[in-house]
């Protein structure tokens, strides 16, 4: 069908290139002298034959070139498609490997009875806020942001509870109460402890943050707005940033990223392309009143976390030092 169309256009092009004189001769020959008709017919046959030969040659070369160009384009498309599939597969594998280490944290306030007694049933409690965290070790230590559990940390009336939901190494989901082990408001870090009851947990694999480079890929996993196990992808946008801590001091060497960190992502891990934890997601700049990520987000560098968490696990934070 394509060749028929090409030949038709070629013939039309050939006919239209004839001069008005030749065209008028052709018309006159059809209506008059036989001598003129024969001469003009021979001349026209010669012109048509030469043009047709040229057209056939051009079409033949195009026929040879077009399939070759199409084959190259198709091969390039397949290569790009395979690259995309490989990248997607890497992202899927990274998420499947690391998400079992991420926990969902609910800050719960227990209700009081009319007589002032506290109801200890968490099912009747009010969820004051949600956040994220990650499994530090197989003993049940959980790392999160201080501001995620600040109400529990400063509770003087026994009204606050912390519920930690996660999966064990077998993929079984369970929830336990998180008890405070240690706090570091200066760096917006906290360590909780849950009872494992013989379950095997999935601790994160720790990376380093001192060798990060702007432009490298990074991945944030958390529970934004209560949507558990949400993955967002971006790059390291900046290094050595300074951000405020919950107590008004400054956290230095923060990692800036455009991977979305929304409300509920706080405390979750920031990962590199190998699935190693390189930071703790903690803050985002938002437009006033929107509460949504602006693409300027921050994480506490893992080197700071590695210096802080073991100390908190060993020495803890005395209750009197929380206020």
UniProtKB/Swiss-Prot annotation:
InterPro entries membership: Chloro_Bact_Ser_Proteases, Peptidase_S1_PA, Peptidase_S1_PA_chymotrypsin, Peptidase_S1C
Cross-referenced Gene3D superfamilies: Trypsin-like serine proteases
Pfam families for the chain: Trypsin_2 (PF13365)
Active-site feature positions: 147 (charge relay system), 188 (charge relay system), 266 (charge relay system)
SUPFAM superfamilies: Trypsin-like serine proteases
Gene Ontology BP term (one): proteolysis
Domain of life: Eukaryota
Factors inducing expression: By light.
The protein's Enzyme Commission number: 3.4.21.-
Intracellular or extracellular location(s): Plastid, Chloroplast thylakoid lumen
Region (Serine protease): 186-283
One GO cellular component term noted in the UniProt record for this chain: chloroplast
Entry keyword set: Chloroplast, Hydrolase, Plastid, Protease, Serine protease, Thylakoid, Transit peptide
UniProt GO MF annotations: serine-type endopeptidase activity
Residue range of the transit peptide in the UniProt record, numbered on this chain: 1-28, 29-73
Keyword Lyase: no
Top-level enzyme category: hydrolase
Physiological role: Probable serine protease.
Family: Belongs to the peptidase S1C family.
Protein's name according to its UniProt entry: Protease Do-like 5, chloroplastic
Lineage of source species: Eukaryota, Viridiplantae, Streptophyta, Embryophyta, Tracheophyta
